[in-house]
Amino acid sequence: MGQETEAVGQMEKLLALFAAERMKSLAAPEVQALVECWKQYITAYHYNCTDEILSALGQMYASDERFAQNIDRFGQGTARFMSGAIAFYCSR
């Protein structure tokens, strides 16, 4: 499996996990651990993901319709939930 295929598979796995957790509190330890996994995923496959970059990405996931639609394929409201969870993570 190539690195790009691996990256897409990992991304989809994480997005599915965000979708599965979307009814939980943004502050729930398992949700915040998932945000940390997302940050590590971006660093491993794309670029060094600082909290500042992560915060900007989180805002974009909910505000940019293209991102929101793609993320919400995993479950309606996942993009907004993910954005909120990232904002909570970055505010600590």
Predicted regions and their residues:
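Amphipathic alpha-helical "stalk" segments
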Residues: M1-R92
